[in-house]
Amino acid sequence: MPWAIWVDRDKCIGCYSCIVACKLEHNLPPYPVHPPLGNPQGPELIRVHRVGPHIRDEEIHQHFQPVLCVHCPDAPCIEACLCSAIYKDIETGITLVDQDECTGCKSCLEVCPYGAPQFYDGKLYLCDLCIHRLGQRGRERRYTACEAACPARAIHVGTTDEISAMMGKKAAERAGKEEKRIGQ
């Protein structure tokens, strides 16, 4: 069964714990000695963007939008990769990168609808859903570093069926709240 990730942006508080946990888990530098101009903080497999504040319905709104690889079933980055450095793990469906094969052409960046690919020192970095934590190739449930570190419990990793069920439940909750708000 393929694995997936979903971030409930209504719960994300923008604390950046996911970024710190991911960098520690993957031994990525927080700040390189000689930072390149375009990426002074080193590679980030997950980024968090602040959206807002803005006024809607006479209220101030702001939310945070984590950006990371969502491991698309038909990942366009795999098709676009000219050197076949991006591939799917057959058992888990996780999109992975062979950095030794990556030539840094950035063709994957052009086609990713999420802006997930990160380049640092000429190599591609993508979230790998902490595949090394999944136990025996996805059969044993363990938390990813970002999921375990999130104090708001906004990050969810599971099988595609589990994630679809969570997203469906969230959509139903939102629809109920909107219906209630309109009825007032």
Regions found by a protein language model. Name each.
Residues 1-184:
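Non-ligating segments of multi-cofactor redox enzymes
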